[in-house]
Amino acid sequence: MSIFDFTREPISITKPIRLIELFAGYGSQAMVLKRMGAKFEHHRVVEFDKYAIASYNAVHGTDFPTMDITKVHAEDLNICDTNAFTYLLTYSFPCTDLSVAGKQAGMSKGSGTRSGLLWEVERILTEIRDSNGELPQILFMENVPQVHSQDNMPDFRKWLDFLESLGYTNYYQDLNAKNYGVAQNRERCFMFSFLGEYNYHFPQPIPLKKKLKDYLEDNVDEKYYINNEKADKLIKQLIDNGTLPQHNLDRQTDRQTDRQTDLR
């Protein structure tokens, strides 16, 4: 317990939720809200990748077009009537340049990295403020823990300072899926920002009652197995030539060129 437990009002949502997802992917954060039983409206979705938005629409029964975050402006989000609605804006930007599995090029403003697309969110929120518009009451971000590593902390601190300048109170913490009832060792940084001075606590750990074997099937259809002949051919080509078959390479290149988000 801290002094803020006494001086700040606990956050509570009493109005209908309008969800705005930037870097939406296939809508995993909307899926979580549904699993929680939350009632909400898919208000706006910003996703550049055509495959991801097709998946989003198929999963959620929506019909959103692709949108480029670099071309989105304040008016495109259509945030209005905040007295009647709670706007929840998610912005889980690409972790590509932060993850230990990537090149760790960082997220500095103007760096041109995919993780640097975070600052497009700054631009949009600044446009809202400067036009005397209505800011979303809740912001949510999920990313790899390296988002606040020693190397990235200066940029992360700039981001926190910017949000505080708009009137947000920020809470962030690294949480691991294995501590919340899921048989997976997956650590991520979660951050909530509330417009105003509100108190918030991240949930307490949940005992793990399932193991990986509980999710596995005893009998699996043959179609889910890799064909040995094709696998051997692929491995041989990789060893001999160091290349993938061209049709697979073209498809992957197309996807990588189109994406602004990673489907975490």
Tell where the protein language model's regions lie, with residue ranges.
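S-adenosyl-L-methionine
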Residues: 1-48, 52
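Short, structured coil segments at secondary-structure junctions
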Residues: 39, 59-60
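Conserved acidic residues
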Residues: 49, 65-73, 174-178
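N-terminal Rossmann-like NAD(P) cofactor-binding module of classical short-chain dehydrogenase/reductase
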Residues: 88-90
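Accessory recognition modules or surfaces
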Residues: 2-17, 62, 183-185, 189-194
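Class I S-adenosyl-L-methionine
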Residues: 75-85, 96-264
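Conserved SAM-binding loop
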Residues: 56
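Active-site beta-strand/loop signature of hydrolases that rely on acidic residues for catalysis
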Residues: 25, 47, 68, 137-143
